Protein backbone atom coordinates (compact mmCIF):
# COMPACT_ATOMS: atom_id res chain seq x y z
CA UNK A 1 0.00 0.00 0.00
CA UNK A 2 1.26 3.50 -0.69
CA UNK A 3 2.98 5.31 2.17
CA UNK A 4 0.80 7.63 4.29
CA UNK A 5 -2.45 6.28 2.92
CA UNK A 6 -3.32 3.80 5.67
CA UNK A 7 -2.87 2.83 9.31
CA UNK A 8 -2.18 -0.74 10.36
CA UNK A 9 -2.93 -1.60 13.98
CA UNK A 10 -0.54 -4.26 15.25
CA UNK A 11 -1.61 -6.32 18.25
CA UNK A 12 -0.07 -9.16 20.20
CA UNK A 13 -2.41 -12.13 20.52
CA UNK A 14 -2.62 -14.36 23.62
CA UNK A 15 -0.69 -17.00 21.63
CA UNK A 16 2.23 -14.58 21.29
CA UNK A 17 1.54 -14.00 17.59
CA UNK A 18 1.61 -10.43 16.32
CA UNK A 19 -1.00 -9.53 13.71
CA UNK A 20 -1.78 -6.32 11.89
CA UNK A 21 -5.08 -5.14 10.45
CA UNK A 22 -5.89 -2.10 8.33
CA UNK A 23 -7.48 0.30 10.84
CA UNK A 24 -7.77 3.43 8.68
CA UNK A 25 -7.63 4.35 5.00
CA UNK A 26 -7.11 7.85 3.66
CA UNK A 27 -9.45 6.91 0.81
CA UNK A 28 -12.04 4.37 1.92
CA UNK A 29 -13.58 4.42 -1.57
CA UNK A 30 -11.92 4.13 -4.97
CA UNK A 31 -11.24 7.59 -6.36
CA UNK A 32 -12.10 9.51 -9.46
CA UNK A 33 -10.99 7.82 -12.66
CA UNK A 34 -10.78 4.37 -11.08
CA UNK A 35 -12.81 1.66 -12.82
CA UNK A 36 -14.65 1.17 -9.51
CA UNK A 37 -14.98 4.85 -8.59
CA UNK A 38 -17.10 5.33 -5.45
CA UNK A 39 -16.96 1.65 -4.42
CA UNK A 40 -15.48 0.80 -1.02
CA UNK A 41 -11.95 -0.55 -1.45
CA UNK A 42 -11.83 -4.32 -1.45
CA UNK A 43 -9.24 -7.02 -2.04
CA UNK A 44 -9.82 -6.91 -5.82
CA UNK A 45 -6.31 -8.03 -6.82
CA UNK A 46 -6.34 -11.21 -4.74
CA UNK A 47 -5.61 -14.27 -6.89
CA UNK A 48 -8.32 -16.19 -5.02
CA UNK A 49 -11.64 -15.04 -6.50
CA UNK A 50 -13.46 -16.02 -3.28
CA UNK A 51 -11.45 -13.37 -1.38
CA UNK A 52 -11.75 -10.47 -3.83
CA UNK A 53 -14.85 -9.07 -2.11
CA UNK A 54 -13.11 -8.67 1.30
CA UNK A 55 -13.05 -5.04 2.37
CA UNK A 56 -9.55 -3.57 2.78
CA UNK A 57 -10.61 -1.71 5.94
CA UNK A 58 -10.26 -4.32 8.69
CA UNK A 59 -8.28 -6.71 6.51
CA UNK A 60 -5.47 -8.62 8.25
CA UNK A 61 -2.32 -7.78 6.29
CA UNK A 62 0.35 -8.87 8.81
CA UNK A 63 0.38 -12.19 10.62
CA UNK A 64 2.26 -15.10 12.13
CA UNK A 65 5.01 -12.84 13.46
CA UNK A 66 6.63 -14.01 16.68
CA UNK A 67 9.20 -12.23 18.82
CA UNK A 68 12.75 -13.56 18.61
CA UNK A 69 15.75 -11.65 19.99
CA UNK A 70 13.80 -8.38 20.09
CA UNK A 71 12.57 -8.64 16.48
CA UNK A 72 9.42 -10.07 14.91
CA UNK A 73 10.06 -12.91 12.48
CA UNK A 74 8.58 -15.86 10.66
CA UNK A 75 5.41 -14.23 9.44
CA UNK A 76 3.86 -12.69 6.39
CA UNK A 77 2.92 -9.33 4.95
CA UNK A 78 0.02 -9.15 2.51
CA UNK A 79 -0.17 -6.31 -0.03
CA UNK A 80 -3.78 -5.79 -1.10
CA UNK A 81 -2.68 -3.34 -3.81
CA UNK A 82 -1.14 -6.17 -5.82
CA UNK A 83 -2.74 -9.19 -4.15
CA UNK A 84 0.58 -10.74 -3.16
CA UNK A 85 1.82 -12.33 0.04
CA UNK A 86 5.42 -11.87 1.19
CA UNK A 87 7.58 -13.30 3.95
CA UNK A 88 7.40 -10.80 6.79
CA UNK A 89 9.56 -9.46 9.57
CA UNK A 90 9.63 -6.32 11.68
CA UNK A 91 11.87 -4.49 14.09
CA UNK A 92 11.83 -1.18 15.90
CA UNK A 93 14.12 1.44 14.37
CA UNK A 94 13.46 3.74 17.31
CA UNK A 95 10.70 4.31 19.87
CA UNK A 96 8.24 5.58 17.24
CA UNK A 97 9.32 3.86 14.01
CA UNK A 98 8.71 0.25 13.00
CA UNK A 99 10.58 -1.20 10.04
CA UNK A 100 8.20 -3.65 8.38
CA UNK A 101 9.79 -5.86 5.75
CA UNK A 102 8.15 -7.93 3.07
CA UNK A 103 10.50 -10.18 1.13
CA UNK A 104 10.44 -12.76 -1.63
CA UNK A 105 12.76 -15.10 0.26
CA UNK A 106 12.46 -16.52 3.76
CA UNK A 107 15.80 -15.04 4.86
CA UNK A 108 14.63 -11.52 3.97
CA UNK A 109 17.46 -10.75 1.56
CA UNK A 110 15.30 -9.73 -1.41
CA UNK A 111 12.44 -7.44 -0.49
CA UNK A 112 11.26 -4.03 0.57
CA UNK A 113 11.30 -2.38 3.98
CA UNK A 114 8.69 0.22 4.79
CA UNK A 115 8.95 2.64 7.71
CA UNK A 116 5.80 2.77 9.80
CA UNK A 117 5.40 5.71 12.17
CA UNK A 118 3.58 5.28 15.48
CA UNK A 119 0.22 7.05 15.59
CA UNK A 120 0.46 9.26 18.67
CA UNK A 121 -3.13 10.55 18.49
CA UNK A 122 -5.46 7.78 17.28
CA UNK A 123 -8.52 9.98 17.88
CA UNK A 124 -7.33 12.28 15.07
CA UNK A 125 -8.20 9.41 12.72
CA UNK A 126 -11.41 8.42 14.48
CA UNK A 127 -9.65 5.51 16.19
CA UNK A 128 -9.65 4.39 19.81
CA UNK A 129 -6.48 3.45 21.71
What are these regions (language model features)?
Residues 1-2, 101:
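Short His-Asn-centered micro-motif
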Residues 2-88, 117, 121:
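Central antiparallel beta-sheet cores of small beta-barrel/beta-sandwich binding domains
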Residues 17, 97, 113:
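A residue-level signal for beta-strand positions that form part of recognition/binding surfaces
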Residues 95-104:
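Low-complexity, intrinsically disordered Gly/Pro/Thr-rich segments
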Residues 104-129:
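Edge beta-strand at a domain terminus
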Amino acid sequence: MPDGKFIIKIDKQSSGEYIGKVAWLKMKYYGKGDKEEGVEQHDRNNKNSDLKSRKVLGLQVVGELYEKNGNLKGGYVYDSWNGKMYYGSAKMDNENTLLLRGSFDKKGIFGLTQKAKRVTDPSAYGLKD
